[in-house]
């Protein structure tokens, strides 16, 4: 799901984030490990504010954390 299709500025659903990563042949676990984190660390950003993890995920999607989680910023 690309932000230009979203007009209501709601946070992305966690399944949409995971799906977008999958489309890019990535997973949260792989992304975490490639950033020297535990394979489960990035999952925390799906449910609560975690700026470091949010940035890693957003960068992987070519976006900003504010695009994905507008309610947190």
Swiss-Prot record:
It is found in: Host cytoplasm. InterPro entries: Lambda_DNA-bd_dom_sf, Ner_HTH_dom. One of its GO terms (molecular function) is DNA binding. Pfam families: HTH_35 (PF13693). Keywords: DNA-binding, Early protein, Host cytoplasm, Pyruvate, Repressor, Transcription, Transcription regulation. Gene3D superfamilies: lambda repressor-like DNA-binding domains (1.10.260.40). This is Negative regulator of transcription. The lineage of its organism: Viruses, Duplodnaviria, Heunggongvirae, Uroviricota, Caudoviricetes. The gene is ner.
């Amino acid at each position: 799901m690309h932000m230009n299709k979203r007009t209501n500025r709601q946070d992305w659903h966690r399944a949409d984030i995971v799906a977008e990563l999958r489309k890019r042949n990535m997973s949260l676990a792989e992304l975490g490990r490639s950033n020297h984190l535990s394979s489960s660390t990035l999952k925390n950003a799906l449910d609560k504010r975690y700026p470091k993890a949010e940035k890693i995920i957003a960068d992987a999607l070519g976006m900003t954390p504010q695009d994905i989680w507008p309610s947190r910023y």
